[in-house]
Amino acid sequence: MPKFVLTVWKKELLNPEWTSNIEGFDVVSVKVADGVKEYHKEDAAEVIEAASSAGKEVHGWGFHYSTSEDYARKEGEVAAGLCESLSLSGYHWNAEKEWAASDEPDDNAIAFAQSFRLRAPGVKLFANCFNAPVNEVMIGHFDYYEPMIYGTRISTIAGKFQKRFSTPSVDESKQCAMVGTGRINTKNTKQAWGYLNSTGDSFDESGLDRLVRSFKPEYLNFFRAGVIDGEDIMMVPNDINPVLSDQINVIKDSIK
């Protein structure tokens, strides 16, 4: 059974009663860094306290640029310091186009991880990043690989699961996934950013009820909590998907 993670970006986007609707989640992951800077640390601390009081393990995450080894090392030191001061048990290194376009992305990722480990050796470290630059040596410095698997078509998401989970450089025990919450696509309201229920028998019609059972991620991370484009699927279902806590219940039932 995977561990289920709820990623939080900003406290202000959360419903005042948000902790009443996180049943089934094992972990709440809170944004605490942006590059080499702390990110709304006081607000993050309040979210962390609320999540801890609700009995959840708490991780941190940050958007990281890691455009050079020196800068990545500084980012790693800052992130580790925040994990230490906020008592976080895991950290998600979120690295996207800036990192992927750098001259030596794999070396920069390693520099971040090594710097982070020096100060926070006991904190679980997730490579929550673009897929293309990932290799075996780089992933060896992280505890988990957590690619972003997004899409507004059920076939797109299924295809990305298949591709990301067939990366030869990643051991099965490190495989995780970050997925959308199933909120409605505002550009096409017949689509959603994620699908819980399979729509047919073919692989291309697989929702999370089938994909999680088939690919067995160690952690399944939902991005993100709170209001997005006027919708909060933590609190209110939509025409395609139920609220997140109910999604988790269905996934768990599908695995039993």
Predicted regions: what is each one?
Residues R153-I154, A177-K256:
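Substrate-binding cleft of secreted/luminal carbohydrate-active enzymes
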Residues S29-V30, D34-F63, A101-L125:
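Aromatic-lined substrate-binding rim segments of carbohydrate-active enzymes
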Residues M1-D34, H64, F126-F130, F223-V227:
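Boundary/entry segment of secreted carbohydrate-active catalytic domains
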Residues S29-D34, V78-D106, E218-R224:
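Active-site groove signature of glycoside hydrolases
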Residues P16-F25, Y39-E57, V78-S87, N135-H141, ...:
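Acidic (Asp/Glu)-rich catalytic clusters
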Residues L6-E23, E69-E84, C129-M138, I157-A158, ...:
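Short, acidic/polar
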Residues M1-K11, E57-S68, A109-E136, E146-P147, ...:
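Aromatic-lined carbohydrate-recognition surfaces of secreted/lumenal glycan-active proteins
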